[in-house]
């Protein structure tokens, strides 16, 4: 078999169909209960064999540095496999930053999957997820993708059946939200929103989109500081969204639609006020090599 010199990986962004803060763990981290959904909006990551470790972010205003999740993933991979090598990483970002859509986690997952393929390491999904968990809480989900019930700090994942057919319109305001600041605000003021993730899991298993949406919610929404959330939700609902909510710690907000036409009409309306608007469907996978 010929040696691979270059690999391209696609890694889906994620949405939180539900996010509840259950409490605090002994570690001090928040105990979460969530439903995560991969969507057809992808980070594209190209990895090439190299004697050095390099990272490029074409078109990004963020300068590459050792705190980048992609670099952390590469270093974790080399440490775990004891490979004496390098890799050249180019990330073509499509997911907005500080949006609550796990773009950085998707990048890390893409690097782990790509390097596993590039260097023929044959690491299992469980090994990749264990490495990913050391990099970021959402990296294991970015590796698995699809639809998952996620608990703890992101370390307990249960794969669920695909959600019923639907479309998502995602709107990102002109600012981002800091995840630590959002959780700090939650600790100060709490939330009246506590979605029933168990009911949502049952709805997904039953293929019931209405019940899925009825159980949707985000406990961080009221305290995220994202001032456009209410206006975005109202616009999406006016254009037929079954439900609308913030994803993750924000600042992106999305609506769930039954059909593509309504989702795209909502997107066109949103673009009159907000620049970053996306239309996507559920994705049944996670980070994977693009053939």
List PLM regions with ranges.
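ATP-binding N-lobe of GHMP and related small-molecule kinases
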Residues: 1-99, 117, 121-126, 163, ...
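Solvent-exposed alpha-helices and their adjacent loops that cap or buttress functional pockets
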Residues: 2, 37-38, 133-134, 140-143, ...
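Short beta-strand scaffold segments in enzyme catalytic cores
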Residues: 19, 44-47, 138-142, 148-149, ...
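Short, basic/glycine-rich phosphate-binding loops at helix/coil junctions
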Residues: 51-63, 111, 205-216
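Contiguous, small/hydrophobic- and glycine-enriched helical/loop subdomains that border
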Residues: 86, 108, 112-149
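Glycine/serine-rich anion-binding loops at beta->alpha junctions
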Residues: 90-119, 137, 241-257
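Conserved, helical-rich catalytic subdomain that frames metal- and/or nucleotide-binding sites
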Residues: 144, 149-243, 258-264, 268-275, ...
């Amino acid at each position: 078999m010929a040696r691979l010199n270059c690999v391209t990986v696609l890694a889906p962004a994620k949405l939180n169909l539900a996010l509840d803060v259950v409490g605090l763990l002994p570690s001090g981290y928040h105990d979460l209960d969530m439903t995560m959904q991969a969507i057809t909006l992808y980070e594209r990551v190209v990895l090439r064999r190299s004697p050095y470790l390099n990272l490029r972010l074409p078109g990004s205003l963020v300068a590459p540095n050792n705190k980048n999740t992609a670099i952390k993933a590469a270093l974790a991979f080399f440490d775990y496999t004891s490979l004496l090598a390098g890799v050249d990483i180019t990330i073509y970002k499509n997911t907005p930053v500080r949006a609550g859509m796990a773009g950085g986690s998707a990048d890390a997952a893409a690097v782990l999957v790509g390097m596993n393929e590039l260097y023929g390491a044959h690491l299992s999904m469980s090994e990749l997820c264990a490495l990913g968990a050391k990099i970021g809480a959402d990296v294991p989900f970015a590796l698995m993708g699809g639809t998952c019930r996620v608990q703890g700090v992101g370390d307990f994942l249960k794969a669920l059946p695909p959600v019923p057919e639907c479309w998502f319109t995602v709107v990102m305001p002109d600012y981002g939200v800091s995840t630590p600041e959002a959780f700090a605000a939650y600790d100060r003021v709490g939330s009246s929103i506590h979605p029933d993730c168990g009911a949502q899991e049952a709805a997904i298993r039953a293929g019931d989109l209405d019940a899925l949406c009825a159980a949707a919610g985000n406990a961080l929404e009221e305290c995220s500081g994202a001032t456009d959330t209410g206006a975005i939700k109202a616009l999406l609902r006016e254009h037929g969204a079954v439900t609308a909510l913030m994803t993750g710690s924000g600042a992106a907000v999305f609506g769930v639609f039954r059909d593509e036409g309504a989702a795209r009409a909502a997107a066109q309306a949103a673009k009159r006020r907000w620049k970053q608007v996306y239309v996507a469907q559920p994705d049944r996978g996670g980070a994977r090599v693009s053939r």
